[in-house]
UniProtKB/Swiss-Prot annotation:
Antimicrobial peptide with activity against Gram-negative bacteria, but not against Gram-positive bacteria. Active against E.coli (MIC=5 uM), and P.aeruginosa (MIC=40 uM). Acts by disrupting cell membranes. Is able to depolarize membranes of Gram-positive and Gram-negative bacteria. Also acts as a potent chemoattractant for human leukocytes and activates them mainly through a GPCR, possibly FPRL1 coupled to the ERK1/2 MAPK pathway. Is unstructured in water but become helical upon binding to anionic lipids. Keywords: Amphibian defense peptide, Antibiotic, Antimicrobial, Chemotaxis, Immunity, Innate immunity, Membrane, Secreted, Target cell membrane, Target membrane. It comes from Agalychnis dacnicolor. GO terms for biological process: chemotaxis; defense response to bacterium; innate immune response. This is Dermaseptin-DA4.
Length: 32
């Protein structure tokens, strides 16, 4: 139902944030 959709969206957002954080860390370490 609606709740599982909201939960899935939250999971996807968390995963995207994690991936973005990893990419940012990689870019910073490469720049250094």
């Amino acid at each position: 139902g609606m709740w599982s959709k909201i939960k899935n969206a939250g999971k996807a957002a968390k995963a995207a944030a994690k991936a973005a954080g990893k990419a940012a860390l990689g870019a910073v370490s490469e720049a250094m």
